Amino acid sequence: MGYILKILLNIFDYFTLQKVMKKIEFLIGKNFSTLVDVGSHHGEYILSIKKKFNIKEIYGFEPNPIAFEILKKNIINLSGINIYNYGIADTEEDKILNQNIESSSSSINSLNKNSKYYKKKYFLFNFLNLKKVSNSINIKAINLANFIDEKKIDKIDLLKIDTEGYEFKIIKGLEKNISKIKLIHLEHHFDDMIIKNYKFSDIHNYLKNNNFTKIFKIKMKFRKSFEYIYMNKNF
């Protein structure tokens, strides 16, 4: 039963991603120069977007060493993809990655184990007899603004961020280099399972103050999460 549920979620996520990509194609076309993928996991986003778009250079970041090894294998025969076993943060320092029930839900932020959403999720995984992972590991984190400067990247057509509640710090850490980004695709969790210390309105207002406007919004099935696309009005 757990296997069937996972397949169903993957199917729903696939169709959600197709809608997101259709919007991205409408906004910037099928050919563009640079994608930065923060939170690459096993390369699901990179592999999907590589099939649909012609992208000159892709930079992917995945801090979890086990997920990173799978990512390496999944993109081994593809060109133009640069991957790094780092986390992205507002400051360059070692961080603690809290590994959640499934590896794609790991976060630098702490988990609120008293939240109803957390308890429901664990109950479901126990009921389905799915393997649970809940521990912490040390990871290296770098600042994306510094990376952009070091690589001399003049323009990022698409920045995708899926870091389980750490999105706002990554965005703020871009500082002046946020002006080099055309589209930002991010995920936001409205549940209280991850301790974020910010609200979605903080992200929205920060992006708005940096000349970004919200273009797209879609809810992820069976989760209190939404996908958003923001566009830089200066492009």
Question: Can you annotate each of these PLM segments?
Answer:
Residues 1-235:
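Phosphate/nucleotide-binding beta-alpha loop and adjacent structural elements of enzyme active sites
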